[in-house]
């Protein structure tokens, strides 16, 4: 419940632009959020393994 309220709070426009921070759209995590996809690294990894993110595949060399 607390995380959900923080997600709603993050959507509001801050008084100063520098106070804005990114949150994962799926789980609400604050750290390690990929700006391009607006999701955290953990959710990104899960969705990439499931093939739900187009153009993303596991690297192998």
From Swiss-Prot:
Q: Does the keyword Zinc apply?
A: yes
Q: Which UniProt keywords apply?
A: Metal-binding, Ribonucleoprotein, Ribosomal protein, RNA-binding, rRNA-binding, Zinc
Binding of Zn(2+), residues: 24, 27, 40, 43
Write out the GO MF terms.
rRNA binding; structural constituent of ribosome; zinc ion binding
Q: Which cofactor does it need?
A: Zn(2+)
For this chain's record, the cofactor binding note is: Binds 1 zinc ion per subunit.
Q: Which GO terms describe its biological process?
A: translation
GO (cellular component) term, any one: small ribosomal subunit
Coiled coil spans: none
- Report quaternary structure and partners: Part of the 30S ribosomal subunit. Contacts proteins S3 and S10.
Q: What's this protein's function?
A: Binds 16S rRNA, required for the assembly of 30S particles and may also be responsible for determining the conformation of the 16S rRNA at the A site.
Family, as annotated: Belongs to the universal ribosomal protein uS14 family. Zinc-binding uS14 subfamily.
What is this protein's name?
Small ribosomal subunit protein uS14
The species this protein was found in: Metamycoplasma arthritidis (strain 158L3-1) (Mycoplasma arthritidis)
The gene that this protein is the product of is rpsZ
């Amino acid at each position: 419940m607390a995380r959900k309220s923080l997600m709603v709070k993050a959507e509001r426009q801050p008084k100063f632009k520098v106070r804005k921070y990114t949150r994962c759209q799926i789980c609400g995590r604050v750290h390690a959020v990929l700006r391009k996809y607006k999701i955290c690294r953990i959710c990104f990894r899960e969705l990439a393994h499931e093939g739900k993110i187009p153009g993303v595949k596991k690297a192998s060399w």
